[in-house]
């Protein structure tokens, strides 16, 4: 006969309890996964989401701890922190709303993808940014500034429009107009330079866009061929507003050193205060590049190029008209107080003899036929995008939200840094 000691009985009891706990944990995990799948199916069903009982279930708040209920309540978030989705038929946008089809661009913090909205069947360019990468470089202010600028310029024909923005715990999503005529940079690389009428047309549309931004007290600061797109008809569309500076009035200045080396104005290199005329310098640099094939003071050696911008006189070859020479000399004036646009901003550019052939009212209404048609056959025509992007596989993580149970502390911290990012347009913007 086997006699069980007290220790043996305790070990047996502990083993049974541990086994029961393991079974219970496995059961709870399975139920939780099943419940999560069930809720996801409901959330993805637009008809179910409209049912009052379903809405009340999805809005249940977690119970508060008794000791917390009597604690001093936290102050309400400031207006800039509140998530304002607005009255919209799609107030809870999420990655699974889209089919992400192709990578069409890349940047420091993420990718731009061609996406088709599943319900609307509409095509968009979705800019997907990694929050942790943004925070690591302390660029969250620039990202929120880009969002704010996009909200302001949705009505202008030569500025890319933001349809809505949303976020997951680890990513930000800008849902933008899909523009597939190619970057101006791409077309310049292929053709080396443009004839003067074509360069004038593009410069006029760019100037119109910059003038509109200035009317909103926004300085663009990063004009370059890579940020200038052509739409399917051949009109200019300005994109990428990450370096925009808001609240710069007519005589206001700022001093942040930023931009792209080839297009930096002398006052920026000198680290002096600068104003809206920095954009007119950049317009001059882009116009020069369209006419001659390279930026005006270009050198492969960045230090030499900076010295050229600061000290080298502007050299113009004789193969352009006198009005083109005059406008380039005015825009690329090293002294910003004497630069074309210093007194009356866009009106000076608009009234310059170089643009005398432009009917500005027809231009803004897109009644002028562009000098070049990209001839795209439809949204799936990607011929004007760099194959380096379009041949890259679409990451699986782009189209799904991370499991909240698996979020790390750093991801949660990143999630909290972009309160107020999400945006949906008011209903009247769809009318």
UniProtKB/Swiss-Prot annotation:
Known regulation of activity: Two specific sites, one in the kinase domain (Thr-256) and the other in the C-terminal regulatory region (Ser-422), need to be phosphorylated for its full activation. Phosphorylation at Ser-397 and Ser-401 are also essential for its activity. Activated by WNK1, WNK2, WNK3 and WNK4; which promote phosphorylation by mTORC2.
Post-translational modifications: Regulated by phosphorylation. Activated by phosphorylation on Ser-422 by mTORC2, transforming it into a substrate for PDPK1 which phosphorylates it on Thr-256. Phosphorylation on Ser-397 and Ser-401 are also essential for its activity. Phosphorylation on Ser-78 by MAPK7 is required for growth factor-induced cell cycle progression. Ubiquitinated by NEDD4L; which promotes proteasomal degradation. Ubiquitinated by SYVN1 at the endoplasmic reticulum; which promotes rapid proteasomal degradation and maintains a high turnover rate in resting cells.
Protein localization: Cytoplasm; Nucleus; Endoplasmic reticulum membrane; Cell membrane
Chain positions found as Phosphothreonine: 256, 369
Phosphoserine PTM positions: 74, 78, 397, 401, 422
GO molecular function terms listed in the Swiss-Prot or TrEMBL record: ATP binding; protein serine kinase activity; protein serine/threonine kinase activity
Residue ranges of every copy of the Protein kinase domain listed in the record: 98-355
GO biological process: apoptotic process
Region (Disordered): 64-92
Major place of residence: cytoplasm
UniProt keyword list: Apoptosis, ATP-binding, Cell membrane, Cytoplasm, Disulfide bond, Endoplasmic reticulum, Kinase, Membrane, Mitochondrion, Nucleotide-binding, Nucleus, Phosphoprotein, Serine/threonine-protein kinase, Stress response, Transferase, Ubl conjugation
Chain intervals for the UniProt region annotation (Necessary for localization to the mitochondria): 1-60
Catalytic activity from the UniProt record: L-seryl-[protein] + ATP = O-phospho-L-seryl-[protein] + ADP + H(+); L-threonyl-[protein] + ATP = O-phospho-L-threonyl-[protein] + ADP + H(+)
Top-level enzyme category: transferase
SMART domains referenced in this protein's UniProt entry, alphabetically: S_TK_X, S_TKc
Active site, UniProt feature: 222 (proton acceptor)
Binding site for ATP: 104-112, 127
EC number: 2.7.11.1
Short sequence motif Nuclear localization signal: positions: 131-141
A GO CC term assigned to this protein in UniProt: plasma membrane
Chain intervals with Polar residues compositional bias: 81-91
Protein purpose: Serine/threonine-protein kinase which is involved in the regulation of a wide variety of ion channels, membrane transporters, cellular enzymes, transcription factors, neuronal excitability, cell growth, proliferation, survival, migration and apoptosis. Plays an important role in cellular stress response.
Subunit structure: Homodimer; disulfide-linked. Forms a trimeric complex with FBXW7 and NOTCH1. Interacts with MAPK3/ERK1, MAPK1/ERK2, MAP2K1/MEK1, MAP2K2/MEK2, NEDD4, NEDD4L, MAPT/TAU, MAPK7, CREB1, SLC9A3R2/NHERF2 and KCNJ1/ROMK1. Associates with the mammalian target of rapamycin complex 2 (mTORC2) via an interaction with MAPKAP1/SIN1.
PANTHER family, A to Z: RIBOSOMAL PROTEIN S6 KINASE (PTHR24351)
Entry similarity comment: Belongs to the protein kinase superfamily. AGC Ser/Thr protein kinase family.
Name of this protein: Serine/threonine-protein kinase Sgk1
Source organism per UniProt: Bos taurus
